[in-house]
Structures are given as C-alpha cells and as structure tokens.
Amino acid sequence: MPGDVGRVLVVDDSQVIRQLIKVNLELDGFEVMTASDGEECLEAVHRFAPDVITLDLAMPRLDGMRTVGRLRVDARTAQIPLVLVSASAAPEVPVGVDAVLAKPFEPAELVGLVRALCERARKRAVHLAKPLAERRCPSRTLAP
C-alpha cells in the first residue's frame, strides 16, 4: 500500500526528473507528491506532511538552498530530512541538508537513501514522543 514505507515530497523543475524519482519511490512503497520549485514546496509541505523532501539545487522562483533555509527556520518543518539532488552537487553536504545525491544517480541509491532517512526520522519521532523523564533516565527499580 502506498505510504507504508514513508511519504516523500519531490521538488524539481524538470518534469522528467520528478517523474523518474516519483516512479522509483512509488515502486518501493513510498507515497509521493511533487512540486516544480521551492515556492510550490513551501505551499505543499504542510498539506502533505512528508517524512523526507528531495530538492533540486537549481530551480526558478525559489532555488534549493533558499528553500532549505525557509524549511529550517519553520518549527513545523525544521526536522524533516532533506536530500539535495543536483548535477552540480558539492562533495560536502551543505548546512541544513541531510544528504546530497548527484545526478545522474542509480535508482537503488535514491531509494536506499530516502528509506534510511525515513527510518531515521521515525526513530527520532518515537524518541521525542517519550516523556522527557523517560528519555533522561531509564526506569530504575530496586530488586526486592
């Protein structure tokens, strides 16, 4: 069933790339929504509530790094893992980005990376859902 693995917002100005990423993720069980630039991403992110966002670096209106900046300053989206997908990807991961995927990429590499980030985000959400006292000190009982 779509979405069992996670929800991904794919942001790229190329319809071909959006479709390529979407199809590969959907084949692996992800629910996918697409946006053609950073502005559309910011409009869609609250409606769709993705577990991971993939972002192209060079897009019209609002590029990938400016979109990253806006997502990171919004408390509602600050913790969503972000993958920068770009033909001109730098070897190091820019501040605010969780991973970089260079174009062209292997579909298995994309799916594996997104899956790992979804799992990490879910573990973090489970951890944060625990009461603060439980996170700080595991329960300690004295044996009778």
Where in the sequence are the language-model features?
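Short amphipathic alpha-helix used as the core "switch/output" element in two-component signaling
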Residues: 43, 65-78
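Short hydrophobic/Thr-rich beta-strand motif most characteristic of the beta2 strand and flanking loop
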Residues: 29-36, 44
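Active-site residues of response regulator receiver
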Residues: 56, 86
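Receiver (REC) domain active-site loop signature in two-component systems and cognate sites
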Residues: 59
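Acidic catalytic/metal-coordinating carboxylates
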Residues: 36-40, 51, 63-69
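Non-catalytic signal-transmission and effector/linker regions of two-component phosphorelay proteins
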Residues: 1-7, 108-144
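Charged docking surfaces used in two-component/phosphorelay signaling
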Residues: 19-27
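Active-site beta3 strand of CheY-like receiver
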Residues: 48-54
